[in-house]
Amino acid sequence: MKVSPRRRARECAVQALYSWYISQNSIEEVELAFVTDQDMKGVDLPYFRKLLRGTALYVEAIDHDIRPYLDRMENDVDPIERTILRLATYELKYELDVPYKVVINEGIEVAKVFGSDDSHKYINGILDKLAPALGRK
């Protein structure tokens, strides 16, 4: 099955945001390195950039929104799960043209690709509670 350009943008954004989180480099450095080094064929590049930059720009507000729905301390959340939650929360909060059900489903699907065995269930549980709190249900 062919993966949509937006799904590819989300997958790439998760990888780049994870790199940003781990490396502590600027988002501009991470973006440049990512688009230079990775195969960006089939990626909605403008959407990738919007997700990457937007999530990085609003990361403190996003973390504040996510925090009440975590079942553990923020630093105990797996870094890839945290990154997926940040990206999906950015979309729920700031990309209002994307239906909330699509955002949740995409978060689940990206977690199936990058997360551990049960990551998608954890992501689903949090996003399902977070969406109404952000006025998206």
From Swiss-Prot:
NCBIfam families: nusB. GO terms for biological process: DNA-templated transcription termination; transcription antitermination. The lineage of its organism: Bacteria, Pseudomonadati, Pseudomonadota, Gammaproteobacteria, Pasteurellales. This is Transcription antitermination protein NusB. Pfam families: NusB (PF01029). One of its GO terms (molecular function) is RNA binding. Gene3D superfamilies: NusB-like. Keywords: RNA-binding, Transcription, Transcription antitermination, Transcription regulation. CDD domains: Terminator_NusB (cd00619). One of its GO terms (cellular component) is cytosol. It comes from the Bacteria. InterPro entries: NusB-like_sf, NusB_fam, NusB_RsmB_TIM44. HAMAP family: NusB. Belongs to the NusB family. The gene is nusB. Involved in transcription antitermination. Required for transcription of ribosomal RNA (rRNA) genes. Binds specifically to the boxA antiterminator sequence of the ribosomal RNA (rrn) operons.
